């Protein structure tokens, strides 16, 4: 039986393998969720560079959020990463949820990023 970390890595690799097959050169919006914070970055896999990033630890958000571990914080990160992506000239991305299910904070971030102008 696989350990928790091995199962997490297996799920993340399965999602990323699917993303690479459908990306067609589009950058990916990668999301990571910890127990206290949430992080999002837009990565160009062809060039190997991060085009935009945002998290609940950013100075822009830290003072305005009560906590980094709720859906309101995730939505704020989604809007911020969409705003930074538009400044970088990115509008079309592939959503990389990693091993996290599309529910709760991950879903709130994705919907806020869509409202902010990203399409996926």
Swiss-Prot record:
GO biological process: translation
UniProt keyword annotation of Ribonucleoprotein present: yes
Database matches in CDD domains: Ribosomal_L18_L5e
InterPro entries per record: Ribosomal_uL18_bac-type (IPR004389), Ribosomal_uL18_bac/euk (IPR005484)
Any one GO cellular component localisation term in the record: cytosolic large ribosomal subunit
Keyword Protease: no
Gene3D superfamilies: 3.30.420.100
Keywords, alphabetical: Ribonucleoprotein, Ribosomal protein, RNA-binding, rRNA-binding
Disulfide linkage: none
GO molecular function list: 5S rRNA binding; structural constituent of ribosome
Highest taxon, organism lineage: Bacteria
Family to which the UniProt record says this protein belongs: Belongs to the universal ribosomal protein uL18 family.
Subunit structure: Part of the 50S ribosomal subunit; part of the 5S rRNA/L5/L18/L25 subcomplex. Contacts the 5S and 23S rRNAs.
Annotated function: This is one of the proteins that bind and probably mediate the attachment of the 5S RNA into the large ribosomal subunit, where it forms part of the central protuberance.
Protein name: Large ribosomal subunit protein uL18
Organism whose genome encodes this protein: Rhizobium etli (strain ATCC 51251 / DSM 11541 / JCM 21823 / NBRC 15573 / CFN 42)
Gene: rplR
């Amino acid at each position: 039986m696989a350990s928790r970390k091995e199962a997490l890595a297996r799920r993340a690799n399965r999602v990323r393998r699917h993303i690479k097959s459908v990306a067609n050169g589009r950058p990916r919006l990668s999301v990571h969720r910890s127990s206290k914070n949430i992080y999002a970055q837009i990565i160009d896999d062809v060039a190997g560079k991060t085009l935009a990033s945002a998290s609940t630890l950013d100075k822009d958000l830290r003072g305005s959020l009560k906590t980094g571990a709720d859906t309101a914080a995730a939505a704020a990160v989604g809007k911020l990463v969409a705003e930074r992506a538009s400044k970088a000239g990115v509008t079309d991305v592939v959503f990389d949820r990693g091993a996290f299910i599309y529910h709760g904070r991950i879903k709130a971030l994705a919907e806020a990023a869509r409202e902010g102008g990203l399409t996926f």
